[in-house]
Curated annotation (Swiss-Prot):
One of the zinc ions is readily exchangeable with other divalent cations such as manganese, which strongly stimulates the enzymatic activity. Aminopeptidase with specificity towards an acidic amino acid at the N-terminus. Likely to play an important role in intracellular protein and peptide metabolism. Belongs to the peptidase M18 family. Ubiquitous. This is Aspartyl aminopeptidase. It comes from Mus musculus (Mouse). Its EC number is 3.4.11.21. The keyword Protease applies. Pfam families: Peptidase_M18. NCBIfam families: PRK02813.1.
Amino acid sequence: MAMNGRARKEAIQATARELLKFVNRSPSPFHVVAECRSRLLQAGFRELKETEGWDIVPENKYFLTRNSSSIIAFAVGGQYVPGNGFSLIGAHTDSPCLRVKRKSRRSQVGYHQVGVETYGGGIWSTWFDRDLTLAGRVIIKCPTSGRLEQRLVHIERPILRIPHLAIHLQRNINENFGPNTEIHLVPILATAVQEELEKGTPEPGPLGATDERHHSVLMSLLCTHLGLSPDSIMEMELCLADTQPAVLGGAYEEFIFAPRLDNLHSCFCALQALIDSCASPASLARDPHVRMVTLYDNEEVGSESAQGAQSLLTELILRRISASPQRLTAFEEAIPKSFMISADMAHAVHPNYSDKHEENHRPLFHKGPVIKVNSKQRYASNAVSESMIREVAGQVGVPLQDLMVRNDSPCGTTIGPILASRLGLRVLDLGSPQLAMHSIRETACTTGVLQTLTLFKGFFELFPSVSRNLLVD
């Protein structure tokens, strides 16, 4: 039964608010995976370890992590046998950000600063004058066992700032502002004057190992937050993050104003669709495929890592699930029967820069997820994969849009072409429309969350039947 206008808006906003929770709990890729892990465990998925043997059973649900920054979750259909296909949705856990250098201790004209490195292709000017903090992981040595352990850290208050230079000292700042990423993107942590007032005159003598690399006040903040002593911290991987939470906005609360929508929007929709598709035991019981979500780290820097889409991770997992002594070519048989949605955000047409889009391909808010096509294979979509997803979308009532870039414009890429070429897998590139991609604060629409989630859930439930009607190799 169709929902009335009010009920539909309530459903749209409820789903969008769940995305807000997901984003606010995920200030780094490590936190993304921790949040996904928590949701999967709550939904009855069982954790696997790559280093152990697996006993994969139909109608059961599993997940594994690598580097604590990539996660793969899958549910095995009740009718699955080795050689059957995989229904996959892939996305990425990382977003452009600034990351703390291994030796971050910097001081200039009385300010204590933190040296940072750019990660990905961020719009770095948007990081100025923001209330920034730190999130990520530290590796500690347990004083009792001597083991190396990981701890997640997220200091939930502003501790860092990158101030703009006053316009009086740079009159052309509104015409030409391009910060030098090595010199101008160094956040302020504290002043030396205040540190002396807080601590008193420091004792002369050699600095400790961590104090040589990082300011003592930074280490003190981290240790206080984690309840650790400074000498227990071996290494750190820390991202800078905005402390302003993700929110709904606009006169009708139809917009999502948030950090890291590229690509936490897709991560959330993919993961929740997998969980929701398994909520009915009957749905999974009659599925001949394996439903799978693959969320990779390091997409924003090329995916060439042990936990990235360029690695052997996906192939190894698919091979382990397919393995059968009675059917030695099960993996090779499964790949042509499989399909992946490469889920990554799409550029909505901008009201102030509409000429940047090709005139017949201008995605709008509220009009559905966007199929992304590029003849130069920057996206992996083709006529076959597009037709199959259109069939699914039609059955679940989700509208679709199209995006092709102008001939005189560069085109980004995704994990789609990587996995299509690496596995020989049929792939479609698709994403929800957004504005301000790679800004510290991005913009999407509330409708896009429910539309994308509905499409993804429909894909998991319907793809096996849709694929049986495909007469193309």
